[in-house]
UniProtKB/Swiss-Prot annotation:
Quaternary state and interactors: Homodimer.
Annotated compartments: Cytoplasm
Protein name per UniProt: Methionine--tRNA ligase
Gene source species: Escherichia coli O17:K52:H18 (strain UMN026 / ExPEC)
Gene Ontology cellular-component terms listed: cytosol
Length: 677
């Protein structure tokens, strides 16, 4: 059946430009690339684009930490990201940046249209402000306890445990991620996108049946809890685009980040000198298809804010969102200490890209399920499937064809019915690729590979080769095996681009989806060269060890107090619980005759007096100034006999020593005898 060629625009979520690409990122880019390559094989016009997400406070602060400009940092990171994606043969037509003139113009255009249409609201809000750093704190730079499920250590915009979204001011016991200080509240005028105005449209889009069931169900929960206006502005200092006619106010990174899809495509059109495609793909009534491959952690932004922004600014909405789960390694979250937090570049130093592309593909489905990269299973599956079943099929037949028949295949098929079984599978396998049921496609292909190898085993060309007068049979059997290999590699072409190149060189023909309907008859193949090498666990061990070493090398050198006075060995809670810390009032403080380091302190523990010798004289040359001050002491320390008398405890102080000793004091209201817990 002839397919009508479609116009398709495909995007992956934009990697953030403050860190390297790792194997978790690669799941999405591989999934999208396999789907895109299949669409291209079927004759569709596909534009596959991405960009770096290059704005926000994290980038600003990291650049400061590195002593370079944000522009320099994101430029270097973009080159690294593009090198990694090229190494994994991700076939992007364009890779751009949100820090671009195209993105600035489109962000301002969408904002102005939303404002003209009454969807931008101004109001003064109270924000968390870091008093130590002198800056308002973005959502991701505040952590605290989730106000909904009470999970600790959650960011200021959404909870990674229950998925709830909220304002940073709703966090329980918030702390600044930048300085560790407790934020204070300050007022600031902000701009809000009126998301609730689009509730009806979004619910209709949800019910259209296009979205994954899990996404639609999650969206329904959000509708039931009520949509809120969305804060789209941030205060200076901020690295991003300044909002027109609003000095000191910047677009929130999540406003201009998805617009980066449009910016990258506009950049591609401009490079091509194409003045019509941008409008053709993005206009309100566009018939082109638009798909976003994203992770489950950013569904909220892509399923609510993004389509509403597009609707409100008179652009088309996505055709669908293709959402995937996370990657675990060996059944657990990726870990730097275990060496399973693996960068894309590190992987390519130890394995080829096709191996990971195959393993991920074999495990992917259209559902939002997490994928486990079990490294032992990875080795076994790559060897069993790619090497033993597919590549071996070619190698065990090619030798006879090259040596005995000068590389020329038979003029007729030895088993036309078996070949038809292989080509008839194109519909089922194609539908699996189309619907992103990648694991099913691989299972179907490997079942065919088993059939092909069974055929060769039964025909035993190595036996036939020794029998006189059976040259025609030998040529027919081996030609059949090579033709079946060709069909298998055609089905696997979206997954294994580098192996496909080598297979095409051997077969002396391009692999096309429609081409398999005609077998290679009387066709000359090239001399066979090894197509793929087996892998082993030693490579895995080297990969893990290299990842550990990279973490050590990348560790930020410790500076300041920790460099001179490292944190001591970890103790248990039971050990700590033995220490009884109490608030004490300094009733008297005096020099100790015969010592140039000690002060004698008389402490009131709320009904009990203690005599303590403390080596703080260098920092407190006037002991009388300490009288009447509250401090903290270790109350259950065994008395220590000294030359000057008995010391009945220890007062708590911080600092490196000398003049830099700082006696600790409790907050106002604490009374002598209060226990420190």
């Amino acid at each position: 059946m002839t397919q009508v060629a479609k116009k398709i625009l495909v995007t992956c979520a934009l990697p953030y430009a403050n860190g390297s690409i790792h194997l978790g990122h690669m799941l999405e880019h591989i999934q999208a690339d396999v789907w895109v390559r299949y669409q291209r094989m079927r004759g569709h016009e596909v534009n596959f684009i991405c960009a770096d997400d290059a704005h926000g406070t994290p980038i600003m602060l990291k650049a400061q930490q590195l002593g370079i400009t944000p522009e320099q940092m994101i430029g270097e990171m973009s080159q690294e990201h593009q090198t990694d994606f090229a190494g994994f043969n991700i076939s992007y037509d364009n890779y751009h940046s949100t820090h671009s003139e195209e993105n600035r113009q489109l962000s301002e255009l969408i904002y102005s249209r939303l404002k003209e249409n009454g969807f931008i609201k101004n109001r003064t809000i109270s924000q968390l402000y870091d008093p130590e750093k002198g800056m308002f704190l973005p959502d991701r730079f505040v952590k605290g306890t989730c106000p909904k499920c009470k999970s600790p250590d959650q960011y200021g915009d959404n909870c990674e445990v229950c998925g709830a979204t909220y304002s940073p001011t709703e966090l329980i016991e918030p702390k600044s991620v930048v300085s560790g200080a407790t934020p204070v509240m300050r007022d600031s005028e902000h701009f809000f996108f009126d998301l609730p105005s689009f509730s009806e449209m979004l619910q209709a889009w949800t019910r259209s049946g296009a979205l994954q069931e899990q996404v639609a169900n999650k969206m329904q929960e959000w509708f039931e809890s009520g949509l809120q206006q969305w804060d789209i502005s941030r205060d200076a200092p901020y690295f991003g685009f300044e909002i027109p006619n609003a000095p000191g106010k910047y677009f929130y990174v999540w406003l201009d980040a998805p617009i980066g899809y449009m910016g990258s495509f506009k950049n591609l059109c401009d490079k091509r000198g194409d003045t019509t495609s941008f409008d053709e793909y993005w206009k309100k009534d566009s018939t082109a298809e638009l798909y976003h491959f994203i992770g489950k952690d950013i569904v909220y932004f892509h399923s609510l804010f993004w389509p509403a922004m597009l609707e409100g600014s008179n652009f088309r909405k996505p055709t669908n969102l293709f959402v995937h789960g996370y990657v675990t390694v060996n059944g657990a979250k990726m870990s730097k200490s275990r060496g399973t937090f693996i960068k894309a570049s590190t992987w390519l130093n130890h394995f080829d890209a096709d191996s990971l592309r195959y393993y991920y593909t074999a495990k992917l489905s259209s559902r939002i399920d997490d994928i486990d990269l079990n490294l032992e299973d990875f080795v076994q599956r790559v060897n069993a499937d790619i090497v033993n079943k597919v590549v071996n099929l070619a190698s065990r037949n090619a030798g006879f064809i090259n040596k005995r028949f000068d590389g020329v295949l038979a003029s007729e098929l030895a088993d036309p019915q078996l070949y038809k079984t292989f080509t008839d599978a194109a519909e089922v396998i194609g539908e699996a690729w189309e619907s992103r049921e990648f694991g099913k496609a691989i299972r179907e292909i490997m079942a065919l590979a088993d059939l092909a190898n069974r055929y060769v085993d039964e025909q035993a060309p190595w036996v036939v080769a020794k029998q006189e007068g059976r040259d025609a049979d030998l040529q027919a059997i081996c030609s059949m095996g090579i033709n079946l290999f060709r069909v298998l590699m055609t089905y696997l072409k979206p997954v294994l681009p580098k192996l496909t190149e080598r297979a095409e060189a051997f077969l002396n023909t391009e692999l096309t989806w429609h081409g398999i309907q005609q077998p290679l008859l009387g066709h000359k193949v090239n001399p066979f060269k090894a197509l793929y090498n087996r892998i082993d666990m030693k490579q895995v061990e080297a990969l893990v060890e290299a990842s550990k070493e990279e973490v050590k090398a990348a560790a930020t050198p410790v500076t300041g107090p920790l460099a001179d006075d490292p944190i001591q060995e970890t103790i248990t809670f039971d050990d700590f619980a033995k220490v009884d810390l109490r608030v004490a009032l300094i009733e008297n403080a005096e020099f100790v005759e015969g010592s140039d380091k000690l002060l004698r302190l008389t402490l009131d523990l709320g009904g009990e007096k203690r005599n303590v010798f403390s080596g703080i004289r260098s920092a407190y040359p006037d002991p009388q100034a300490l009288i009447g001050r509250h401090t903290i002491m270790v109350a259950n320390l065994a008395p220590r006999k000294m030359r000057f008398g008995i010391s009945e405890g220890m007062v708590m102080a911080a600092g490196p020593g000398g003049k830099d000793i700082f006696l600790l004091s409790p907050d106002a209201g604490a009374k002598p005898g209060h226990q420190v817990k």
